[in-house]
Amino acid sequence: MDNFAYLMNNKAKGIGMNNTTFVNSSGLEDGDKANYSTVYDMALLSGYAINNSLYKQIVGTKEITVKTDLKTYVWHNKNKLLSSYKYCVGGKTGFTEKARRTLVTNASSDGVNLTVVTFNDGNDFGDHKDLYEKYFDVLNEYEILSEGPIKTKYDNTYISRSFKMSLTKDEYKKLKKEIIYYDDNASNIIGKVKVSLNDKEYFTEDIYIKKEVKEVKLNFFQKIIKRIKELW
């Protein structure tokens, strides 16, 4: 189990959860040992996990029925927003003595995907719904970068990933896109494009260049020499 917690911590750091430490896989207090995190880190984790189709299916399931020869079992998801709020697509409830009621939820409307996290909140379901209603009204999804051609000082440059963000109109106006060129562009990567808002970086992607391979035309004697080399 210690090894699994080690892997969990490595993954957490890999997705930017810099204020999180896991000591076990359950998330529960274990004597003097305690898992700790922040609402921001939990939002990063949930936003990352919801992109996994199996995870999304599990956390978005309202109830599941299992029949055996002896009995039928029905389990209900404790995330009440799945039933009471039409835009909710998943989430996870929790409780510990120190953190009290914890709730992580995800919601999606008109292409805008949001995550809300609360700790020690006795009105968590109501607060989550209120926050979603507030920000769905002011946020729009913008495609910041599109996979394919990108304008640089070189011809035939492109990126291999698209990038979208949910922003207010004011945030969109303040968004910065910066192209950084590498000194050595002998490879097919000539630099990177960086997207930031209020000095915080949100996305970085390598910029590639399509280098044309020119066909070398051989004269009659060069063709003979080439053929002799191939035979030997």
List each model region and its residues.
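Domain-terminus/edge residues, biased toward the C-terminal soluble/receptor-binding domains
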Residues: 17-21, 33-232
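Surface-exposed aromatic
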Residues: 23-31
